[in-house]
């Protein structure tokens, strides 16, 4: 006593701790095996301390749940009483055997202790509910079940469950039947409705046989209500039940492939006959509704999925080829001739016989599809007098449905075709003006682009020699060339600066020549400005036609979207380094391998629109110079003697022009050198490692050097 009291008093803290642990284990187990109840799991948790072993045993099937705790009906109880007596005797006398087997199993001490002290009431909570010898049905069952578990693991005659004694007492026989019983146990659950009707079921053997016969009889009209029940209320099935299904069917199905094929061929002939007879009737009777079809589907489980495009609906062939689906096999095994199985080629027949080998049970989920996608032809014998050949009725239903469905299918396909034609005719009309414009501009740009692409190729040539190396734009373009022919950076047109500088050198000639030259210069400056603007616009994606639009849009990169052919500027990465982090080895600015431009990116306040602002300043300067030139030229034509003044004006004007030129040249260079780097910085704004290029002072990139 003293020991017990001390255990009850001092062990309280420990016990709560243990309970918490067990609760945690229970939670995880219920998550993993949602179809196991707590009552099932509690005993496992007590029996094995390690969570992994429990999971292992459950998944391997070394441990099973209690049978369903459903209250048996009176008939069942009366049938099972003889067996039940044996069970209770067994459970009562089993204490010694159970203890021994538990030790042999190496079960933890807690289990043996619980068995030892089961009579006392001070045991841990779960055991207060189940004192060892209580006779209430559930606990008796549990007791018996626990023993059966042990028996399955170490097959000792002592721990044998009473079930086996009913059929054969030798444990060798039991061993050979172990697998059978594993397969049959889950099937018992599924077969419960049929079992309730059949009368002789004390032991498991009859159940197994009966389940086989049930399977064979299944699809015939007698068993129709059963199937309806199974479909209408989805049954909760254990994974074991699902997994162990196919073998039974495979047996049945392999017995009967020849019969099936004969049935199908007979059906074909009769279908041909009736199809010719009934074409007239058919059109008047296309009103069968889908709901009726659905009812037939459930009443008689023989469902044939429709293939819409298989045939056009003609006078004779209102039927069309159907693949015998996995779900059909039950039905096909016992086709009565009321269902038109429809014409199948020889290949389809072979398929059917092959498919018979592995037939899954059609689960309740499929019942939902039946109404919509599977037309099924039920047994129509209820509606007809038995003398009338059942063929006819089935055929009628079949034909209404068949004629109905393809017609609707045809309508929808026609409608779809019309709409697609309309869309197709509209689309080119919408696109043509834009396309024409862009094609024109691009054909104008082509020679220019090719020249630039060649230049860029040459410039980057050394980089193709290093096999593993890829420079930033390499995969951005869809053409073979890298991005440059899309004008993402503009190579300055050569030849303009040189021409103008030569003209500058000639400006010491007579004033009449000077005036002509000045006019030429004006034109050239205007051209140059336009070209620069075009370059910038192309570089930012504005088509070169919009000159003023450029200033309105402030040349922002967002206007890339006005030119569909251009690559998007920010998402520009090609696949190959989509996944690299955008840091030193793979990131942007390695343009010159040997470091031809030792530049650094300015810090965060960098202005991406600098070039545009410079060009605007240039515009203002040239406008001023133009206006002054106009005044000068008019005054010069009026009076020659004022040439001195005019010369002064000219010199001023020349200096202005020279400044504008210098600015333009500088700007072109700026574009060439810094455009890429600018783009790189912009590209990296969206990237995960936002290094702004090589800034050796910045905190972010310091680690890489």
Curated annotation (Swiss-Prot):
Task: For this UniProt record, give its keywords in alphabetical order, as a comma-separated list.
Answer: Chromosome, Cytoplasm, DNA damage, DNA repair, DNA-binding, Nucleus, Telomere, Ubl conjugation, Ubl conjugation pathway
Q: Provide a GO biological process annotation.
A: DNA repair
Biased-composition ranges, Low complexity, are: 91-112, 162-173, 184-205, 331-358, 399-438, 500-512, 624-656
**Entry PTM:** Ubiquitinated. Proteolytically cleaved by the proteasome in response to transcription stress; the resulting N-terminal form constitutes the activated nuclear form and the C-terminal portion is degraded.
- What sequence ranges are listed for the domain CUE? 21-63
Localisation per UniProt entry: Cytoplasm; Nucleus; Chromosome, Telomere
> What's in the GO CC field?
chromosome, telomeric region; cytoplasm; nucleus
Q: Where is the composition biased (Basic and acidic residues)?
A: 65-90, 206-217, 248-258, 299-310
Q: Where is the composition biased (Polar residues)?
A: 119-140, 614-623
Keyword Glycoprotein found: no
Q: Which domain of life is it from?
A: Eukaryota
Q: What is its main location?
A: cytoplasm
Q: Where is this region: Disordered?
A: 1-20, 62-264, 277-438, 491-512, 614-656
Q: Which GO terms describe its molecular function?
A: DNA binding
Indicate yes or no for the key word DNA damage.
yes
Q: Which family does it belong to?
A: Belongs to the DEF1 family.
State the protein's purpose: Recruits the ubiquitination machinery to RNA polymerase II for polyubiquitination, removal and degradation, when the transcription-coupled repair (TCR) factor RAD26 fails to efficiently displace stalled RNA polymerase II. Also involved in telomere length regulation. Binds DNA.
Q: Oligomeric state and partners?
A: Homodimer; may form higher order oligomers. Interacts with the large RNA polymerase II subunit RPO21; the interaction is direct and serves to bridge RPO21 to the Elongin complex in a manner dependent on transcription stress. Interacts with RAD26.
Please give the name of this protein. Answer: RNA polymerase II degradation factor 1
Q: Which organism is it from?
A: Eremothecium gossypii (strain ATCC 10895 / CBS 109.51 / FGSC 9923 / NRRL Y-1056) (Yeast)
Gene giving rise to this polypeptide: DEF1
